């Protein structure tokens, strides 16, 4: 590397707080997969992880961990979350504690110390695979940067991260995510045991320019995140993962540190090949370490004690393939089951005579996908490529009416788009308050299976009604809540970003809030997450395919007051709007996969354009929208669209006056 290149890398490190630096591995060879110029179509050629790929990743990671005196648990997954292997080194910590750095936080998942190491490693691997595409390579360190109370973290005058709340998606209780059937890898997207991870140590894996999976590593006793990105960490989890990814590492031009959001460069990894203590190209074989340095694990609900090959993303076996029926000319992709039967073709709503028809649902999804294909992506490279998103439409009962995806959209957006749609529909309905008042409380753990306290969900209803100055809020359906508006109310500071401001009514106060204790969003699904941990520990049955209405461990996880409208949980960052026929709520649309302003625009304009085309439905009337409210003297936001969003047009302010 030239002196000029080194100088530029250092300057970028200081100015952008990105990982920068050399990407060389021990031995001086760049470990990044050569850039194939992939923009979303490379996966058309079936590409997947082989058994040898998985074994090599584990063997390389084990060698690096040994050199560091660390004992790690390592997981490898394919792009749709099939767990291909989990390997635990001798002496590895088997129980992990959830804990944020700094001042102790009281409640939520903070301090829970019974999380199996295997689940932490799997969650890290899934996160890296699900956040990455041919246009971007994100890691769990990237996730850490974009889910905290400020973006960038510790910048006390900046709003929360753009994907604030995404950590509680892909949940093990989701009715959308598929489950391990006990055999070979199959159709996904598969659930993640802890949602998405913000703990460094999860990296995506690439072959021939396309994402084929992820590797996750846990070698300490803490499942955490990085709250200070002004420095460069020497993190064993991350460096062991870097070694594991060698030979399958992300192309340099697609890495997070090549991508800026709101003028801030994202982080990829604080470690590179030059920081390794071993040369992965000469690591011992897997056969020589298996049952010597450690063992393959069987993880209930995820994998047997074996090594498997992954599925080829974008082809039927992966559960995601090109559409052949409903969206001609739109380069659409759909979800299918293990028999290649489409899971979510457009159907009519279930909520009575005013319900959306199948034709209307198809039109909404088609218009939204058309908009995404026209729009300039924020988080993909090269510049000028289209936004790639997942789009979900639900009715007012939360029933899935249709899901469609753009080419190479990130996998995480499937579950998140559904969460967003359901959240907008639920909080805009007449039954939200009663439903929240009727679910069991979140039973917080004090470390292990000891009750810290119980948190009733009704507290959030009371807080919202008081905060908004509307005694009938969440009961009369008078206000249309988008996810951007609901997100405003879910931040630990209101208005967002100013440390010391009061918390929103759906959030937690200081001392109780953290990314592992977000408020209503977590409390609604808390008991389900604990039950699933108990299942993996052979202490409870597995969680049902609904994340709500589950009581605490002290009541044997009994179910009561299940909220069908929120079966996969809620989401609290932008990208959804409710849908109306006149003033009658008939459902909602959720969009996820690119920048949040792009997600907002695709949802809002998708409904608008479909309604203009067919007539009879559309966005909420302006007097109903949440941006008519000014709680605490600060106006809520409804949607926020990019100023000049389209690739081949200079049209501006495309959402204005609609």
Predicted features by range, described:
Residues 1-7:
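Bacterial N-terminal signal peptides that target proteins for export
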Residues 23-658:
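Flexible, solvent-exposed loop/hinge segments and secondary-structure transition points
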């Amino acid at each position: 590397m030239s002196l000029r290149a080194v100088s530029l890398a250092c300057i970028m490190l200081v100015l952008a707080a990105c990982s920068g630096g050399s990407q060389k591995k021990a031995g001086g060879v760049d470990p990044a997969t050569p850039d194939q110029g992939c923009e979303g179509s490379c996966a058309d050629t079936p590409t997947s992880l082989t058994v040898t790929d998985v074994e090599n990743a584990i063997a390389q990671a084990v060698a690096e961990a040994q050199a560091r005196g660390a004992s790690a648990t390592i997981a490898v997954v394919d792009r749709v979350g099939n767990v291909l292997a989990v390997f635990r080194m001798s002496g590895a910590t088997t129980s992990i504690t959830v804990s944020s750095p700094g001042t102790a936080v009281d409640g939520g998942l903070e301090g829970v110390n019974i999380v199996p190491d295997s689940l932490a490693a799997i969650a890290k691997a899934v996160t890296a695979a699900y956040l990455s595409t041919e246009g971007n390579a994100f890691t769990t360190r990237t996730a850490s940067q974009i889910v905290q109370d400020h973006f960038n973290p510790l910048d006390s005058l900046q709003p929360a991260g753009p994907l604030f709340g995404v950590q509680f998606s892909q949940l093990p209780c989701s009715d959308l995510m598929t489950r391990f059937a006990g055999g070979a890898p199959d159709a996904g997207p598969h659930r993640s045991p802890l949602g998405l991870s913000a703990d460094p140590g999860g990296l995506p894996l690439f072959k021939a320019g396309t994402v084929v999976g992820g590797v996750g590593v846990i070698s300490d006793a803490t499942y955490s995140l990085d709250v200070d990105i002004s420095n460069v960490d020497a993190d064993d989890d991350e460096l062991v993962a870097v070694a594991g990814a060698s030979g399958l590492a992300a192309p340099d031009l697609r890495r997070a540190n090549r991508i800026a959001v709101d003028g801030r460069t994202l982080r990829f990894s604080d470690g590179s090949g030059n920081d390794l203590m071993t040369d992965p190209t000469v690591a011992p074989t897997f056969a020589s370490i298996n049952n010597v340095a450690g063992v393959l694990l069987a993880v209930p609900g995820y994998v047997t004690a074996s090594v498997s090959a992954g599925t080829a993303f974008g082809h039927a076996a992966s559960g995601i393939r090109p559409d052949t029926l409903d969206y001609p000319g739109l380069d659409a992709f759909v979800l299918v089951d293990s028999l290649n039967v489409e899971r979510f073709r457009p159907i009519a709503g279930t909520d009575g005579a005013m319900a959306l028809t199948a034709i209307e649902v198809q039109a909404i999804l088609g218009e939204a996908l058309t908009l995404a294909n026209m729009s300039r992506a924020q988080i993909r490279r090269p510049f000028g490529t289209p936004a790639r998103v997942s789009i979900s439409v639900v009715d007012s009962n939360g029933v899935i009416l249709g899901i469609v995806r753009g080419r190479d959209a990130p996998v995480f957006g499937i579950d998140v788009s559904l969460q967003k749609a359901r959240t907008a529909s639920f909080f805009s309905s007449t039954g939200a308050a009663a439903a929240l008042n009727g679910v069991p409380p979140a039973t917080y753990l004090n470390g292990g299976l000891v009750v810290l306290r119980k948190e009733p969900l009704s507290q959030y209803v009371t807080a919202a009604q008081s905060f908004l100055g509307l005694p009938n809020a969440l009961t009369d359906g008078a206000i249309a809540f988008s996810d951007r508006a609901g997100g405003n109310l879910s931040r630990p500071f209101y208005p967002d970003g100013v440390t010391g401001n009061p918390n929103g009514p759906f959030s937690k106060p200081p001392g109780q809030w953290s990314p592992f204790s977000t408020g209503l969003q977590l409390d609604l699904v808390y008991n389900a997450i604990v039950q699933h941990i108990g299942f993996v520990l052979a202490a409870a049955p597995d969680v049902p395919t609904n994340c709500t209405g589950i009581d605490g461990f002290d009541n044997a996880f009994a179910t009561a007051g299940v909220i069908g409208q929120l079966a996969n949980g809620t989401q609290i960052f932008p990208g959804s709007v409710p849908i109306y026929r006149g003033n009658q709520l008939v459902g909602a649309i959720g969009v996820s996969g690119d920048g949040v302003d792009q997600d907002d625009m695709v949802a809002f304009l998708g409904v608008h354009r479909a309604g203009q085309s067919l007539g009879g439905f559309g966005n909420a009337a302006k007097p109903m929208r949440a941006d008519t409210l000014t709680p605490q003297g600060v106006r809520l936001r409804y949607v926020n669209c990019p100023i000049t969003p389209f690739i081949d047009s200079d049209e501006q302010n495309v959402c204005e006056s609609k």
